[in-house]
């Protein structure tokens, strides 16, 4: 029903890509039709139709964060709230206001359990450099509050792209939309369990909280049922010509951020490297698969 309606509206002309359908197809929804598109989307979800929609970024877009937390257990709701409060408080200092927080039910990824969390700031418009800088500010805040975890691996960087490589990054799956993923047991080759498709449907992100940015900032629990106003909060596309400018923090938490002076004396000792790697895997939380590639003194 939803895809047929999109075709009737001639949204499938691919002239200015706005949405990708993970079950096949792309859409070009003009901004003056976005409200109608959102209304039809909610109508389809409420009717029980399974949708697979990933919204693509406009040149300037409403800021968002993608958390991919993998560990031997899933995050609790309390832990999710704690992490999101730290992130939202940091973004608030740079002009962010209310934030929509959506959560995907935990799923098994290899030997780990993945907890996915999406955060959306409506009308908090950024360009690519500012989005990347905001992520770095978030990494600093999380590392100070919860230093035992490698947040650089958890706060997805790929969604923002890379300025130097001129890559734009990915889009953002809409709330209540499912995901078509490779069926890992058969490696996507197709088997009896996945009915020969090689793919499985992964469940949707559901809105659970709103961060209220007032003087006493707090998280408010919300109804996860399909809701037009909540869907509009999650939209990343915008026509807004103005965007905020955020400079990177003075201390950036990312891999490979050492100076030339710090890396001029490399230690070539495989036995020592192995001992340090073993110590890290055994004693540092969340680092059970870490690999030591180089040592410097």
Regions found by a protein language model. Give the residues of each.
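Charged, compositionally biased non-catalytic regions
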Residues: 1-3, 122-138, 245-284
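Short beta-strand elements
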Residues: 95-105, 153, 159
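Ordered, helix-dominated protein-protein interaction surfaces in large eukaryotic regulatory proteins
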Residues: 67, 89, 93, 121-123, ...
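Long, contiguous regulatory modules within eukaryotic nuclear regulatory proteins
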Residues: 87-89, 136, 150-153, 162, ...
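Histidine-centered divalent-metal-coordination microenvironment in nucleic-acid enzymes
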Residues: 60-65, 98-134, 168-177
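Well-ordered, non-membrane alpha-helical segments in soluble/globular domains
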Residues: 77-90, 131-148, 272, 276
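DNA replication initiation on ssDNA origins
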Residues: 1-84, 94, 157-161, 165-192, ...
């Amino acid at each position: 029903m939803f895809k047929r309606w999109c075709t009737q509206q001639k949204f499938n002309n691919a002239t200015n890509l706005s949405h990708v359908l993970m079950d096949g197809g792309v859409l070009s929804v003009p901004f003056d039709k976005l409200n109608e598109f959102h209304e039809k989307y909610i109508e389809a979800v409420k009717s029980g139709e399974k949708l697979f929609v990933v919204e693509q970024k406009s040149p300037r877009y409403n800021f968002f964060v993608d958390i991919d937390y993998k560990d031997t257990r899933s995050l609790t709701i309390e832990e999710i709230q704690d992490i999101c409060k730290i992130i939202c408080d940091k973004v608030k200092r740079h002009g962010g206001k209310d934030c929509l927080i959506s959560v995907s039910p935990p799923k098994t990824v290899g030997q780990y359990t993945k907890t996915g969390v999406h955060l959306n700031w409506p009308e908090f418009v950024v360009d690519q450099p500012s989005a990347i800088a905001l992520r770095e500010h978030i990494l600093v805040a999380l590392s100070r509050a919860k230093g035992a975890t490698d947040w650089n691996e958890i706060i997805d960087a790929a969604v923002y792209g890379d300025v130097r490589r001129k890559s734009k990054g990915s889009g953002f799956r809409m709330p209540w939309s499912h995901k078509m993923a490779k069926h890992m047991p058969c490696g996507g080759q197709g088997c009896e369990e996945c009915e020969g498709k090689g793919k499985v449907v992964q469940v949707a992100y559901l809105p659970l909280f709103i961060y209220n940015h007032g003087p006493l900032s707090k998280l408010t629990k919300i109804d996860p049922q399909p809701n037009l106003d909540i869907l509009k909060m999650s939209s990343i596309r915008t026509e807004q010509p103005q965007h905020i400018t955020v400079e990177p923090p003075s201390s950036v938490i990312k891999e490979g951020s050492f100076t030339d002076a710090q890396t001029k004396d490399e230690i070539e000792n495989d036995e020592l490297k192995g001992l340090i790697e073993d110590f890290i895997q055994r004693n540092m939380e969340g680092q059970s698969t870490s690999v030591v590639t180089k040592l410097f003194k």
